[in-house]
Amino acid sequence: MKVGVIGAGVMGRGIAQVSAMAGHSVILFDINHEMIEVAQKAIDSNLKKAIDLKKITTEEKDATQERIQFSNSIADVNVDLVIEAIVEKIDVKLKVFNELAEINKENTIYASNTSSIPLTQIAAGFKYPQKMIGIHFFNPAHIMKLVEVIRAEQTSAEVLDIATNYVSSIQKRCIIAADSPGFIVNRVARHFYVEGLKILEEDVASNETIDELIRSAGFKMGPFELMDLIGVETNLSVTESMYELFNYDQKFRPNRIQQKKVQAGYFGRKSGQGFYTYDK
């Protein structure tokens, strides 16, 4: 299968890497040339780490990289499966999807990696609604085993089968989720972040203490470490979307501390500053 990944950010390049490692031909597209360069270096670094951990051989690394084509031209994205991993704005996603629909063949499938936008709503604005589906990876995509597959009201049974087979082919655990706000994982996880922010806001504990306690309870990361990894602005966008989709239920209300971080440009690891400070 030839896979086209739209967006060379952290999520997009992870999806491209894991697809290529599974033997799929991949084209990774981004309009930003610098993002392409960063993605190339990040994938190379990830694969070198995998060699050091004896998970792959040098030959497998080389073969994986040979399967990935990088491009700044959307006209190059002529594939069997499109996976979009761009900004969480439906108008931007639909513009890209409908542009790709003019380039690709009739049997191409279109998937969104959206964290919270209803797939039925995306499909409704797309030229081929029956070919739209959600394939939601978790960060970092080349490591995290779980993938949610979300069927829109319009998605055909054939497209659902192809999507689930693709997820299985890249050695991920596939969970079929209903098209509801936040799907399964993000709906449950929202309280992980929201309550952590409330505790910080009420001066019950510092973000360092909260993260340390959560790790001590068996979690790999605390809420603030995880927000910095995902992107504070990305996490806030999901919370805002779910708050609106759940008719402004207060349990999903965005927190002012997080909003101020975003306003200041403190996005986490990617910017060098979030709830913690990082070397860029």
Predicted regions and their residues:
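Rossmann-fold dinucleotide-binding core
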Residues: I109-D179, F183-R187
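Rossmann-like NAD(P)-binding element
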Residues: V38, K49-I109, I117
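A non-catalytic, amphipathic alpha-helix used as a structural packing/dimerization or gating element
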Residues: E34-S45, V92, E158-S169, T209-E212, ...
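NAD(P)-dependent Rossmann-like dehydrogenase/reductase catalytic/cofactor-binding core
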Residues: A22-I27, S168-D179, E201-E202, N207-K280
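NAD(P)+-binding Rossmann beta1-loop-alpha1 motif at the extreme N-terminus of oxidoreductases
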Residues: M1-K49, L53
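A general alpha-helix detector
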Residues: N46, K145-L146, F192-G196, G222, ...
